[in-house]
Amino acid sequence: MVQVRMFGMARFQSGVKSFECDAKTVNELMNQVPNMKRRDVRDLVILMNGKSVSKRYRFKDGDEVVLMSPIGGG
């Protein structure tokens, strides 16, 4: 299982702070985020153990994923 934590607008949109899922890849995870459509999830920053990963990354049991809205400023 993969532990997923939500931050920022991602948390607000999904209505959850965290959840567990059985996705094997980031691409699969994008279809399992509660209360969010895939098109909304693909705009999020996806960090795996603190580092950005591709949609093809294969999870290992116990991985921790963070989903958060992009941060911008000026």
Each predicted region: which residue ranges?
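Ubiquitin-like/PB1-type beta-grasp interaction modules and other compact soluble beta-rich domains
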Residues: 1-73
